[in-house]
A protein has these predicted regions:
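C-terminal regions of mature proteins
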Residues: 196-201, 349-429
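Second-shell loop/turn segments in exported
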Residues: 49, 66, 97-101, 121, ...
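His/Glu-rich zincin catalytic helix
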Residues: 1-75, 183-291, 410-429
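Short, flexible turn/loop "capping" segments at secondary-structure junctions
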Residues: 89-92, 164-166, 187-193, 248, ...
Length: 429
């Protein structure tokens, strides 16, 4: 590990407020670009100026679907695919991202990406048609055990925040969406000042910025202010939730909330501390996981990590387990031991070096690089700053974070059990 940034990212902010980051990779054939808005499923109440606007659940995701429709009747997805690109998009609790990868015609595909995201076109007929498509997607998700176990964990952890609800919304909430709803949210959140453009490519960074400057609105618009309601308590709204679905083995997620640091260097340090703590305590190389794996209580689907959801951050672990309560008991025991004794220094250093190596190898995963750059900018920091910062984080710092976060009263458990099994369902998915 070194305290240096392994690669240089070109950075600029355009007069319209768009932040551009480009990592040049001249020896790679494939290029990647992401245009992202700081707007996600949890951002349902906002203002630009003095007037507050309330929107139903699911608007950000709905908008992501509809922006591919162009005013001339064409479809941006088809246009990008026809030009050799592989495009897609996603909406999370606090971000919407549109992206493509390609080996040729990068500039042409970048033109298409910038044009369709900045050119909204909605009609009553097209919005009504999309309601049926998304409603079907929502109903299919209701029977998806992976979505159900996550959704119910959010219901347990969150009392009020919009992250409690599915990003796609509900069949009832999306029925309230109109063309005017979509136009209002696009005007507010898709201003260049609330967006970032991140690319890994062979094209000169100045050229990438110039194309964005030509195609996006030139005005420097105000950034919307969002309201997520009263701050969440760090204790969960509900301690556990169990449902029955068509699964072959029970699935579980155990989680806890923690309060995000202010945007900037403190946010990045907290993110790295949380991720490093989770891997050192509960990761696949830890005694916790290996003991439970040998005992048949956890399987290969297991994972653990931390993530930020607007004004709330989460630490989560889980996977398939035939005895979720036994896993939870071991989590509490592990957290208590680390609170008492701290981390083993040698084991902690091995995990830190492995995490550094994973970050380094990740620089060749272009999609991850672009998404990480975008998330960093929305969090007030530069992705590459993780490299000099990670060696500074101490085992004592991580033990303190884990001790504060993984107290018994802050944990919530979501379980999906097979239909007809012994587990009683506490709620509907």
């Amino acid at each position: 590990m070194t305290n240096e940034r392994p690669e240089h990212v070109w950075a600029a902010t355009l007069p319209n407020g768009l932040r551009v980051r480009v990592l040049c990779k001249p020896d790679f054939q494939r290029s990647y670009a992401v245009l992202a808005a700081c707007y996600g499923g949890a951002d349902r109440r906002f203002r630009v100026g003095d007037t507050w606007t309330d929107t139903p659940a699911g608007v950000a995701h709905y908008l992501e679907h509809k922006l591919f429709d162009m005013p001339d009747g064409s479809d941006a997805l088809t246009a990008l695919c026809g030009n050799g690109a592989s495009p897609n998009a996603f909406t999370s609790a606090n971000m919407t991202a549109y992206y493509f990868s390609c080996t040729d015609h990068f500039e042409e595909n970048l033109h298409t990406l910038l044009r369709f995201v900045s050119t909204p076109y909605f009609t009553d007929a097209s919005v009504a048609k999309e309601q049926g498509i998304i409603a079907q997607e929502i109903r299919m998700g209701d029977d998806d055990p992976n979505r159900a176990v996550w959704r119910n964990l959010m219901r347990c952890l969150m009392a009020r925040d919009g992250a409690r609800d599915a990003v796609a919304g509900t069949v009832e909430s999306i029925a309230q969406i109109t063309p005017e709803t979509l136009y209002t949210c696009h005007r507010a959140f898709y201003a260049p000042s609330n967006m970032v453009l991140c690319a890994v490519c062979q094209t000169a960074p100045e050229r990438v910025a110039a194309i964005a400057g030509q195609l996006l609105p030139p005005e420097l618009a105000p950034v919307p202010v969002t309201d997520h309601g009263a701050p969440e308590e760090m204790t969960p709204a509900e301690v556990h939730m169990r449902v029955q679905l068509a699964v072959s083995a029970p699935q579980m997620l155990l989680g806890a909330k923690f309060r995000p640091a202010q945007k900037g260097a403190d946010r990045l340090r907290q993110d790295l501390t949380a991720r490093l703590s989770m891997q050192a305590a509960f990761g696949r190389s830890s005694p916790f996981y290996n003991d439970l794996y040998r005992a048949g209580l956890l399987g290969r689907s297991y994972s653990c990590g931390a993530q930020f959801c607007g004004p709330v951050a989460l630490a989560v672990l889980g996977g398939e387990s035939r005895e979720p309560d036994a896993v939870c008991a071991r989590v509490r025991e592990t957290a208590a031991r680390i609170a008492r004794d701290g981390f083993d220094p040698d084991a902690f250093e091995r995990v830190r070096r492995a995490m550094y190596g994973k970050l380094l190898c990740g620089l060749d995963q272009f999609r991850s690089v672009c998404i990480d750059m975008a998330e960093g900018l929305f969090g007030g920091y530069e992705m590459m700053d993780a490299f000099p910062l990670l060696p500074e984080i101490t085992a004592a710092e991580c033990a303190a974070w884990l001790t504060e976060t993984f107290t018994p009263e802050r944990l919530a458990l979501s379980v999906v059990t097979p239909k007809g099994g012994d587990g009683d369902a506490d709620d509907d998915a």
